[in-house]
Amino acid sequence: MSSPEAIRTVHVYSMHTDPFAQPGSGDAGGMNVYIAQSVRAMLTINPQLKVEVFTLNRTPQAPERAHVEDPEWGSRLVRHYIDVPAAREATKNDLAEYLEDFAQSCVTQAMNVPDVIHAHYWLSGWAAVQAEGAWGRRIFPERVPNGA
């Protein structure tokens, strides 16, 4: 694995919930807080780092913009709202139907090639495996071999 200084761009996949959503709203809860704080910690530790966070848009309308820069971190933290029209307002239990669309959109909408892809929850992990093949990059946490 590269040293922290060698890592310039991290992609964070959180398909089922927006890490920056208000806890208690929708599916937002402890995992959201954990992911958001992890992203902030990475940015604090490495002042050269750029992080792109990808989440599925689950609101009734398309987002006003496909991505936004974070007000605190500027261009170092870009939040992507992946819009798959058929997935709008989908329940968490239905999201597996949209994995391929989400994974493909994460690759096509990215602003930078990632050095590392970090995924949370099995849905995001599956999307990260697909993106790993497209980007030729490692995922973190690393996949565990079958039978291990």
Predicted features by range, described:
Residues M1-A6, A128-I139:
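Short amphipathic alpha-helices and their capping/turn segments at secondary-structure boundaries
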Residues L49, S75, R137-R138:
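A structural micro-motif
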